[in-house]
Design a protein with these regions (language model features):
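Class I SAM-dependent methyltransferase Rossmann-like catalytic core
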Residues: 1-45
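Glycine-centered, small-residue-biased loops immediately flanking beta-strands
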Residues: 48, 72, 154
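A generic alpha-to-beta junction signature in SAM-dependent methyltransferases
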Residues: 43-44, 68-69, 149-150
Length: 185
């Protein structure tokens, strides 16, 4: 990492500061908020069952918790722990590898789900080809969960690295869902 890159990570930008001031562990919360506002993504939370894949540090989970306001249920899964302030009586956190059969079984036992979200990102290497391939694997895994555990008519939001192959992933999603749109919040 160059000195310029490392400085960018050392100093929080406007969105990071805003997220922290609102109690969110990361600025990624604004992606899901904008998706929800633009597409009315999150249904009535009263009976909603949500799955957050690759959830740590927990901004998307916390957004769902606040949106649900104690109703519905959220299942979040990640290799890493959620931030300490991401908690609720209607939250089940599973720490583990999404590829692990026991984790899949546990997540499946708590479904089916009305929405599946994934802001999962691989540990980046700096090699665009490697990082993109790893990101695509995470998207494919999220699509497997959605295809297996999402209720008919359910919604999914997933982060895809912009690399040229996102059109192929969108095409795959169009075969799975009533509609699929690329959107850059």
């Amino acid at each position: 990492m160059s000195a310029k890159q490392s400085k960018a990570y050392a100093e929080p930008d406007f969105w990071s500061k805003k997220a922290f001031s609102e109690g969110y562990p990361a600025r990624s919360v604004y992606k899901l908020r904008e998706i929800d506002e633009k597409f009315d993504f999150i249904p009535n939370p009263k009976n909603c069952n949500a799955l957050d894949l690759g959830a740590a540090p927990g901004s998307w989970t916390l957004f769902l918790l606040r949106k649900f306001n104690g109703e519905g249920h959220i299942v979040s899964c990640d290799l890493n722990e959620l931030a300490k302030n991401v908690k609720g009586d209607n939250l089940t956190f599973i720490q583990g590898d999404l590829n692990d059969a026991a984790v899949r079984e546990k997540i499946g036992s708590l479904g089916p789900y009305d929405i599946v979200v994934s802001d999962a990102a691989p540990l980046t290497t700096g090699n665009r080809i490697v990082d993109t391939a790893r990101s695509e694997q995470l998207v494919d895994m999220a699509l497997w969960y959605a295809g297996t555990m999402l209720k008919t008519g359910g919604n999914m939001a997933v982060k895809i690295f912009q690399n040229g192959s996102q059109q192929a992933l969108l095409q795959k999603m169009r075969g799975m869902f009533e509609s699929a749109k690329g959107f850059k919040p």
